[in-house]
Amino acid sequence: MLSSQTSSIFTVSRLNQTVRLLLEQEMGQVWISGEISNFTQPASGHWYFTLKDDTAQVRCAMFRNSNRRVTFRPQHGQQVLVRANITLYEPRGDYQIIAESMQPAGEGLLQQKYEQLKAKLHSEGLFDQQHKQPLPSPAHCVGVITSKTGAALHDILHVLKRRDPSLPVIIYPTAVQGDDAPGQIVRAIELANARGECDVLIVGRGGGSLEDLWSFNDERVARAIFASRIPVVSAVGHETDVTIADFVADLRAPTPSAAAEIVSRNQQELLRRIQSAQQRLGMAMDYYLANRSRRFTQIFHRLQQQHPQLRLARQQTALERLRQRMGFALEARIKQATQRQQRVSQRLSQQNPQPRIHRAQSRIQQLEYRLTENIRSRLSEQRERFGNAVTHLEAVSPLATLARGYTVSTTTNGKVLKKIKQVKAGDIMTTRLEDGWLESEVKSVTPGT
């Protein structure tokens, strides 16, 4: 009979190993509540203690890399909530637990509720990014839902006054701690939406323990924030404090002061941007005016080159040259005719053809008359064309405009005055008239209506 059961016989080592594997694989991590006793901390930094209740106890160990994350010092007799792995110490066969985290019993229960509500609302989509409303930019009125006596309100108002003193602020005072706080926060959110006075809400309070911040882990508050038509910025506690309200809000600020920074404009920065824009505009105007001034100078020089008086002088010079050429040509023709006449006379004298001489003389006289008339006609035509050109040039000349009583005024640096803002009282300006120039001092500047 013994031989048939030898396959089921365990050594002590194998038994303890099998039990350890069963405990670790089947149980996994569990939450255990109990009272601490026999707490010790040797030089290694590990914690060793017993966790017990009224009828049982179990040995516990919490290694240094885990207990350094515990925010309090465990005390004998303290009720705690421990998240641990169940195992067995094989050399002695001692059953024990290895703690991974530890919380005071009250906070531990709240943490469980927090995780359950977080999972529930997440599954319903209340945290989805698609539901987040954009914040107004800039905000025209800020609503603040917090305690009227808390430090958070003071911090928010201080930042808003520093950054944007003209920004209107509406305070919806509520309790932020205690049994009545969630209901008051919900009513304040609903009131702000009903009134429609502001375009962004800051909902929050200062720092505290998990119990102090619990109002912002309330399901009613979370759903009120989600239903708000006004964008909500959550500002609960410090940067390390994360509440359900932070997940539901359109934007989470790490602190109340940071929330005020987010919803407000920095007027000093805005002023600097305006001043920078003014400087750039001034530089652009200076460049534009300098460019127009250069363009005006170029046009002015071109007009001077094409001034009617200059063109008239050139025409007169050309006409004088033509007259000289015509005179030279006439003299040459007369000289040639005279020479021909002399030759003919000589020939006639030699041949004495009197009738032919008379005819030749008559022909010469006719030619001289026709030549003279032709010259006179050409001169008359040239004078008429020259007169027409002068009349046309005078019609388009700026001097003609001056002759009608208009004037052109310029500053001391040669810029043409178009608007009164180009001069001020005491400036000297130069005015061009039809027959000359005059300088005058500006006594006063009066804008036109």
Curated annotation (Swiss-Prot):
Its EC number is 3.1.11.6. Pfam families: Exonuc_VII_L, tRNA_anti_2. One of its GO terms (biological process) is DNA catabolic process. It is found in: Cytoplasm. One of its GO terms (molecular function) is exodeoxyribonuclease VII activity. It comes from the Bacteria. It catalyses: Exonucleolytic cleavage in either 5'- to 3'- or 3'- to 5'-direction to yield nucleoside 5'-phosphates. InterPro entries: Exonuc_VII_L, Exonuc_VII_lsu_C, OB-fold_nuc-bd_dom. One of its GO terms (cellular component) is cytoplasm. The keyword Nuclease applies. Keywords: Cytoplasm, Exonuclease, Hydrolase, Nuclease. Its main location: cytoplasm. Heterooligomer composed of large and small subunits. Bidirectionally degrades single-stranded DNA into large acid-insoluble oligonucleotides, which are then degraded further into small acid-soluble oligonucleotides. Belongs to the XseA family. This is Exodeoxyribonuclease 7 large subunit. The gene is xseA.
